[in-house]
């Protein structure tokens, strides 16, 4: 992706987030974006929208189906994308919207990788640790299970990581023995 395309994507995302923020609708916008991104991930919609083989009329039909129960701001955004023929960038724009919402609200997704599934108490403790150590509000808690960690956990927030896994500790111990 070129710098020009990246700048275009970021500008669309910032504009949408600004409008939603002015109208105190960031939570609604975030829910809309997550629902549409889920549709992208369960279908090959991104490929269809970026394909030159798919006629523009077909792309209009596909995006019209996405409008469903979205907020006015999201539907206006989708109309603008269609009007300016930017369908190929929609997936990246929606991801950029989530990043902008995180920056504006200081609420980031938290990825927790552990050897076993977390209990509700552990999840609430993770949220507290994130708030204290990273000075951010935990957004979605994305839980991953990786038995190779042996024990402990890895918390990842906004490109920052806390790794207390036994696997990492064993690797560090092994390096110290050399």
Swiss-Prot record:
Main subcellular location of this protein, as a coarse class: membrane
Compartments, as annotated in UniProt: Cell membrane
Gene Ontology molecular function, alphabetical: proton-transporting ATP synthase activity, rotational mechanism
Membrane topology of this protein: Peripheral membrane protein
Entry's Gene Ontology cellular component terms: plasma membrane; proton-transporting ATP synthase complex
Signal sequence residues: none
Keyword Glycosyltransferase part of the UniProt annotation: no
UniProt keyword annotations, A-Z: ATP synthesis, Cell membrane, CF(1), Hydrogen ion transport, Ion transport, Membrane, Transport
Pfam families to which the protein is assigned, alphabetical: OSCP
Domain of life: Bacteria
Record's function text: F(1)F(0) ATP synthase produces ATP from ADP in the presence of a proton or sodium gradient. F-type ATPases consist of two structural domains, F(1) containing the extramembraneous catalytic core and F(0) containing the membrane proton channel, linked together by a central stalk and a peripheral stalk. During catalysis, ATP synthesis in the catalytic domain of F(1) is coupled via a rotary mechanism of the central stalk subunits to proton translocation. This protein is part of the stalk that links CF(0) to CF(1). It either transmits conformational changes from CF(0) to CF(1) or is implicated in proton conduction.
Complex and partners: F-type ATPases have 2 components, F(1) - the catalytic core - and F(0) - the membrane proton channel. F(1) has five subunits: alpha(3), beta(3), gamma(1), delta(1), epsilon(1). F(0) has three main subunits: a(1), b(2) and c(10-14). The alpha and beta chains form an alternating ring which encloses part of the gamma chain. F(1) is attached to F(0) by a central stalk formed by the gamma and epsilon chains, while a peripheral stalk is formed by the delta and b chains.
Family: Belongs to the ATPase delta chain family.
UniProt-listed NCBIfam families: ATP_synt_delta, PRK05758.2-1
Name of protein: ATP synthase subunit delta
Lineage: Bacteria, Bacillati, Bacillota, Bacilli, Lactobacillales
